[in-house]
Amino acid sequence: MRLACCSLASTIILIYPKHMPTKITREAALRYHEEGRPGKIAIIPTKPYATAYDLSLAYSPGVAEPCLAIAERPADAYRYTSKGNLVGVISNGTAVLGLGNIGAEASKPVMEGKALLFKIYSGIDAFDIEVDATDPEAFISAVKAISPTFGAINLEDIKAPECFEIERRLKAELPIPVMHDDQHGTAIISGAGLVNALELAGKSIGDVRIVISGAGAAAIACARLYCALGAKHEHIVMTDSKGVIRASRTDLNEMKREFATTDEGLTTLQEALVGADVFVGLSKGGMVTGEMVKTMADRPIIFALANPTPEISYEEAKAACPEVLMSTGRTDYPNQINNVLAFPYIFRGALDTHATAINGEMELAATRAIAALAKQPVPDYVCQAYGAKELAFGPEYFIPKPVDHRLIVEVSTAVARAAIESGVARHTITDWEAYAEHLTSLLG
């Protein structure tokens, strides 16, 4: 069963139609975006505007007072404007998932979609900003120039390796959180899945061998987060289109060099998988065969995340090794790794503490909170949304479902606490019970 989400202001309504189409056609997708008011987002006033007095407060002359207050104390922008609940979803359209470099304007539907997800899952308002600049310096300058508008910035669909430098620079030069979700969202969700899959497999993260297929933005971020969780750097082997990333190769950029192996005996993905405990696919479909799975360690963990066709299908992996612990990026198989489990709540916690950054401590807190939620009893409405009688922690359920309303409280709270404890918060939350109630209210 599939579900549709409709948003009325900040209220989420989950609809479970009995006869909802399952195939997404070109005609249906274009009609969805065109019907009624074109696009997927709009701006709604939050203050009264019915009388002349209301309008005089909203604009001239009343608006001068908050302007003067902010000029005197810039932090008051969080008090008198929407900045504290506003994220910029910013892209240049150079690496749009499944579409590639389609350019800034063509990426707008994707960025609007991201803004919609921010709203319905965490109550965050988001503006999509498409920047027509492929040069990193020009892009960085544009984002810095408009940054006072936002409480945080979500970078989206920017190609590697430029995305690394763009994010690094903006993090260093702006006083608000900046996160490239294509990197860190995937890392956080797969990290949560890895923690739980290892527990089910009875293995320690410090002992396992991990093979990552792909060496782009998400792959590098995943490898870094796994190391932060306890994986050993020397136990990670990364591959790209030319095979294993070895230290002797002369065609490696700085990011790939970070995870280059000194084992010169490994040259292919097939060789790397022999005896490996974990495979994380962030490359393209059909890279792994059932025979390759059979050469992996006992109770292997396979995260085949290429979309729409994974590196190996769920059915083929299970046929090769019934005890495999499997995740994909697809909704129609168990343990979907979906960034929507993370980014709405990471930004929620960051905004609510007026954080100056989203740091490693906050990312790890989100990872552990998501992993912990999968071990709790699953509400009936979540089971019903997926046509399941019951969902319980185990091989078929070790990552929470995106429709689980508890995510906003569990993950946002963990991120907010980490922001405060790590020293990047400019606003401290003291009543955590009231904060949890507030978070729940954002979902109606």
Predicted feature residues:
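Glycine-rich phosphate/diphosphate-binding loop of Rossmann-like nucleotide-binding domains
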Residues: L97, I102-S122, L174, H180, ...
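N-terminal ligand-binding/catalytic initiation module
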Residues: M20-V178, S412, R417-R426, H438-G444
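General beta-strand structural signal in soluble alpha/beta enzymes
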Residues: D128, N154-D157, V178-D181, I212, ...
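Adenosine-phosphate binding glycine-rich loop
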Residues: D181, A201, A304-I429
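Solvent-exposed alpha-helices and their adjacent loops that cap or buttress functional pockets
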Residues: Y78-K83, K119-I120, A145-S147, K171-A172, ...
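Cysteine-centered motifs
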Residues: C5-C6
